């Protein structure tokens, strides 16, 4: 899930916020092990570390602009990822206000007004 967001940020800004992860894993289990290695935690801790490292400013979820990054409640349709990530995923604000693109079991999921934990402006 994090690589989708990282690729989106790189496309817009030219900055690869996933440089530490890129090419170091294959498959979900290894990805989640790397999250723990990187920030001693889960998706939430990893995003805190990355956004601090790259100077991404936290913003109010109500003020999101297209392309901004969020941590949010994971889509319940992917129980394995939900369990591995403690029910948290990352996503990108779409062009429709209040809707977030995030990776799901079978591709991208568009969530309308999901529960957002934190948001960062790019």
What annotation goes with each model-predicted range?
Residues 15-25:
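Short acidic alpha-helical/loop segments enriched in Asp/Glu that coordinate divalent cations
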Residues 28-108:
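...with weaker cross-activation on analogous glycine-rich loops/strands in unrelated enzymes
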């Amino acid at each position: 899930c994090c690589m989708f967001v990282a690729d989106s940020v790189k496309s817009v800004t030219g900055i690869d916020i996933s440089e530490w992860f890129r090419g170091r894993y294959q498959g979900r289990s290894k990805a989640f092990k790397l999250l723990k290695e990187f920030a001693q935690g889960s998706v939430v801790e990893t995003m805190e570390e990355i956004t601090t490292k790259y100077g991404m400013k936290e913003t109010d979820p109500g003020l999101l602009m297209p392309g901004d990054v969020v941590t949010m409640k994971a889509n319940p349709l992917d129980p394995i990822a939900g369990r591995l990530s403690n029910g948290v995923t990352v996503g990108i604000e779409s062009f429709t206000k209040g809707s977030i693109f995030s990776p799901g079991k079978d591709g991208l999921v568009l969530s309308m007004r999901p529960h957002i934990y934190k948001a960062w402006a790019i």
